[in-house]
Amino acid sequence: MAKPKRIGKKREKKNIPVGVVHIQASFNNTIITFTDPRGNTISWASSGQSGFKGSRKSTPFAAQVAAEQAARRAQDNGMRTVGIYVKGPGSGRESAMRAINAVGFKVAFIRDITPIPHNGCRPPKRRRV
């Protein structure tokens, strides 16, 4: 006997003209999140979710692809103007911002909110290759 097909509730499109982009660029991955001004997530994408695995996740191209995916989904929800917050030391910072600009968003501001320790935890030892 076949199981009845489950019909889920389809997510409704919100109309949010102004939003905020959070770019979290670590050494291993880049995560891009589009939110409304209150911080509720509209769309998100990451290098790993975009199909890149292993060391290719940390490349600028992977960050660009992820940013384009998240940006298109945010545009479907009516977003036109964004402010950008960038966090982390990763290589995908610049390319993600360029991709968001290329999709057609009007960028209101760009802020770097990378946390800088005031001599907090001891960092990992230097790599010897």
Swiss-Prot record:
InterPro entries listed in its UniProt record: Ribosomal_uS11, Ribosomal_uS11_bac-type, Ribosomal_uS11_CS, Ribosomal_uS11_sf
Protein keywords: Ribonucleoprotein, Ribosomal protein, RNA-binding, rRNA-binding
SUPFAM superfamilies the record matches: Translational machinery components (SSF53137)
GO BP annotation list: translation
Pfam families in alphabetical order: Ribosomal_S11
Database matches in PROSITE patterns: RIBOSOMAL_S11 (PS00054)
GO cellular component: ribonucleoprotein complex; ribosome
Highest rank taxon of the organism: Bacteria
A GO molecular-function annotation: structural constituent of ribosome
Disulfide bond annotation, renumbered to this chain: none
Gene3D superfamilies: Ribosomal protein S11
Functional summary from the UniProt entry: Located on the platform of the 30S subunit, it bridges several disparate RNA helices of the 16S rRNA. Forms part of the Shine-Dalgarno cleft in the 70S ribosome.
UniProt cross-references to HAMAP family, sorted A to Z: Ribosomal_uS11
Oligomer status and interactors: Part of the 30S ribosomal subunit. Interacts with proteins S7 and S18. Binds to IF-3.
Similarity comment: family membership: Belongs to the universal ribosomal protein uS11 family.
Name used for this protein in its record: Small ribosomal subunit protein uS11
Organism: Lawsonia intracellularis (strain PHE/MN1-00)
Recorded name of the encoding gene: rpsK
